[in-house]
Structure formats: structure tokens, C-alpha cells
């Protein structure tokens, strides 16, 4: 794969259930090598949020050692993303791999696999996009497991402050970090 974007992590998944592992790449931001922004204050070093976010990428494994970028066709193109990492799991228990993207200082994305080669972004709709106070947080590396043995995967998301423990309750995710003792 030849991709000039600043990638921070990736997740292998068989999103189309053809038996080949496809690759989701969590891209962070648009960074032009050799081109820097000028800041004049003494503490004015450009931090990551000084640069534009960039879309993640989904590469379909063609089964012959090559991959094809299907990000736009799959409905996963989001030009303003700032992905720190992603995890692939069947979060809605329909047998198809979904993708959860942890973004930096903005809403997180949940791409639900529709089973036809496309995804629908449903993070806000299901309570997976924002922190417990309704704000974007500096999400890092999400991990999934069925922590309460209810048959639904829960998502632990560390961040720069307190983190989130998202558990599905009545069709929506609730942040249980405060009551969990974590």
C-alpha cells in the first residue's frame, strides 16, 4: 500500500465475508512533509490540532496480493476525521464486521456494516460518538469485550482525561465509566 497520509493504526477485518482479510487504516491528519506552519508566540509550536484532519481508508483485499481503496464506495470517507485508532468487531450482532474509530478532540465514528459492501455512520445515533458530557474527547485505543456477559460487546475508550466505558442498554450505548470503578 502506498498512502502518504499520517496513519496511526489499522484493523484487519473481513468486511465483505469473502474469506480474505481487508484493512481499515486509521489516518490522523493531513501533514505535508517539509511544509510547516509559522507560529510566533514563544510556546507556539504547532500541535496536531493545527493541521487538517483526513479520512481513514478501507482497502479491500483482492485475494491476489493486492488491495483496492474502497473508502468512498463503502461510505466511509470522512474528510475531517482525526483517527487515533480503530477496532473492528461485530458490534450489532448481525454477523458482519463493523468499525469503531476513536478520533482526537472530536466525535468518534461507528461504521455499521450494512452487509452489501457499504457502511452507515451511526455514532451519534447510538450514543457512541461523544464523551459523557456531550463533547468530543481525545480518544485513544478502543478495546471491545462483553464485560457484563449480556451478549452485547462493550467498548472501553481511554483518553487524555477520564475515558469512557460504553455499554449497550435498550438499543443505545451509555457511558458507565463513573459507576464502573475504573
Regions found by a protein language model. Name each.
Residues 1-182:
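Acidic, glycine/proline-rich Ca2+-coordinating loop motifs
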Amino acid at each position: 500500500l502506498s498512502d502518504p497520509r499520517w496513519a496511526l493504526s489499522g484493523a484487519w477485518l473481513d468486511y465483505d465475508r469473502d474469506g480474505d482479510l481487508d484493512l481499515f487504516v486509521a489516518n490522523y491528519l493531513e501533514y505535508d512533509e517539509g511544509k510547516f506552519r509559522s507560529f510566533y508566540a514563544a510556546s507556539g509550536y504547532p500541535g496536531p490540532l493545527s493541521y487538517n484532519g483526513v479520512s481513514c481508508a478501507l482497502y479491500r483485499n483482492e485475494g491476489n496480493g493486492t488491495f483496492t481503496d474502497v473508502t468512498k464506495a463503502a461510505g466511509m470517507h470522512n474528510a475531517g476525521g482525526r483517527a487515533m485508532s480503530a477496532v473492528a468487531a461485530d458490534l450489532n450482532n448481525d454477523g458482519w464486521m463493523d468499525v469503531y474509530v476513536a478520533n482526537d478532540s472530536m466525535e468518534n465514528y461507528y461504521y455499521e456494516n450494512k452487509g452489501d459492501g457499504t457502511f452507515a455512520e451511526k455514532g451519534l445515533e447510538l450514543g457512541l460518538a461523544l464523551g459523557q458530557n456531550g463533547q468530543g474527547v481525545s480518544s485513544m485505543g478502543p478495546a471491545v469485550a462483553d464485560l457484563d456477559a449480556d451478549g452485547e460487546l462493550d467498548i472501553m475508550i481511554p483518553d487524555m482525561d477520564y475515558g469512557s466505558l460504553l455499554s449497550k442498554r435498550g438499543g443505545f450505548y451509555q457511558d458507565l465509566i463513573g459507576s464502573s470503578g475504573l
